[in-house]
């Protein structure tokens, strides 16, 4: 994973995603809903919820909206019932794609996802058709914009906390954990005053698929089309993106 920085790819696509700010509160609301549904509504013990709330606040989402979605997820407030669904398939050039959605209308969402694949040179597969090509890992980014953090110190602290790998990047350090160790590592780092730019349990491809310039352009159009859906939460793929 050291040669394929998720953080760099996040930064690379941020400007494009910022152009879709009209949907950003809906995305944050669903992130908060998922985190609270899976781990409870206590920010002190639910690192995923804490991260989702921090990201929402960074985009100026009102506190009332945040609280309302936590209450919906934990059952203390009536509202729409959302269902998590995972789609698997292939993009142009045989790129493996996993799409995580949260929807209150699975028929609508299935049609949107299927249309995005078909229109952009991909095809949906059965459950399990590509998921075996990915590993589930805890992923944490420690900010180091000023370059003041010492790599040896961070590495020792991260390993002490339970991380399995530390990768220095420009302006940040990426940490990887086993999923079951993720919460404890986040807690340890926060208690030791590290600033976390990102933290989540997510998927990483075991191998990467390098495409021709033409096929890569088609693949990026597929990703953009999927991101246009309000229901799509995460898109995982094994494309080796060119610089």
Curated annotation (Swiss-Prot):
<protein>
    <recommendedName>
        <fullName>Probable transcriptional regulatory protein OB2038</fullName>
    </recommendedName>
</protein>
<keyword id="KW-0804">Transcription</keyword>
<dbReference type="InterPro" id="IPR002876">
    <property type="entry name" value="Transcrip_reg_TACO1-like"/>
</dbReference>
<keyword id="KW-0963">Cytoplasm</keyword>
<dbReference type="GO" id="GO:0003677">
    <property type="term" value="F:DNA binding"/>
</dbReference>
<feature type="compositionally biased region" description="Basic residues">
    <location>
        <begin position="1"/>
        <end position="14"/>
    </location>
</feature>
<dbReference type="InterPro" id="IPR026564">
    <property type="entry name" value="Transcrip_reg_TACO1-like_dom3"/>
</dbReference>
<feature type="region of interest" description="Disordered">
    <location>
        <begin position="1"/>
        <end position="21"/>
    </location>
</feature>
<comment type="similarity">
    <text>Belongs to the TACO1 family.</text>
</comment>
<keyword id="KW-0238">DNA-binding</keyword>
<keyword id="KW-0805">Transcription regulation</keyword>
<dbReference type="GO" id="GO:0006355">
    <property type="term" value="P:regulation of DNA-templated transcription"/>
</dbReference>
<dbReference type="InterPro" id="IPR049083">
    <property type="entry name" value="TACO1_YebC_N"/>
</dbReference>
<dbReference type="InterPro" id="IPR048300">
    <property type="entry name" value="TACO1_YebC-like_2nd/3rd_dom"/>
</dbReference>
<dbReference type="InterPro" id="IPR029072">
    <property type="entry name" value="YebC-like"/>
</dbReference>
<dbReference type="Pfam" id="PF01709">
    <property type="entry name" value="Transcrip_reg"/>
</dbReference>
<dbReference type="InterPro" id="IPR017856">
    <property type="entry name" value="Integrase-like_N"/>
</dbReference>
<dbReference type="GO" id="GO:0005829">
    <property type="term" value="C:cytosol"/>
</dbReference>
<dbReference type="Pfam" id="PF20772">
    <property type="entry name" value="TACO1_YebC_N"/>
</dbReference>
